[in-house]
Amino acid sequence: MTKRSNKRREQAETTKAALFESAITLFNEKGYNSVTIEDIARRAGTAKGSFYTYFRTKGDIIIEEFRAIDDYYKRLEKTLMRFSSALEKIYAFNKAQMKYVRDHVGLEMLKILYSHNIMESGAEKILIDTNRYLHGLIKGLVEEGQREGIFRTDVSADRLALLYTRGHRAVFLDWAISDNAFDLVKDGMEFCSVIMLPALMANAGPRSATR
């Protein structure tokens, strides 16, 4: 590949990133429905037509944000290897996930992500997509716990992963509806310890992963 083509690719990546960051900033400031593509392009310092080179609609920005979240999960998965059991890994994942949503995704963006998936006709239902990296990560941890004899085997790992992610979406949705009326990390960890982990366990009694 020539230097010129490398430079064009770098410029394209820079422009796409600028449009994405501008859109996310504006969505947080003004709300998704109040932002136009022209607003996004102006904020990014590029022509309106450039937007359509990288995105078809504003909704594509939402999909891109989900991909960014999944990229975080990929990085996080590597850090979980330092824990010795699947129970500890899921507990650590849950805590990191809650912190990431609170501190990096943020309340306003979370509202936009959920409302877009619920309200937009024809929108890609990425929140419930079992092909997402998140589902595969949780399924892998459940399978590990089943091999260790810690997690129940009367329900498939795939089904348990589905129920797990559904449960945590409920926590995120409750936080968004309440408009940050409770501590997402604190209550999210309580939900994990009191509800989710006992439901995964091979025995009937609740166990805590805290130390």
For each of these PLM feature ranges, what is it?
Residues 98-139, 150, 159:
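Short secondary-structure transition hinges
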Residues 44-55:
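Short hydrophobic/aromatic patch on the recognition helix
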Residues 110, 124, 128, 146-193, ...:
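Hydrophobic/aromatic-rich alpha-helical bundle segments in the mid-to-C-terminal region
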Residues 20, 91, 95, 135, ...:
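An amphipathic alpha-helix signature
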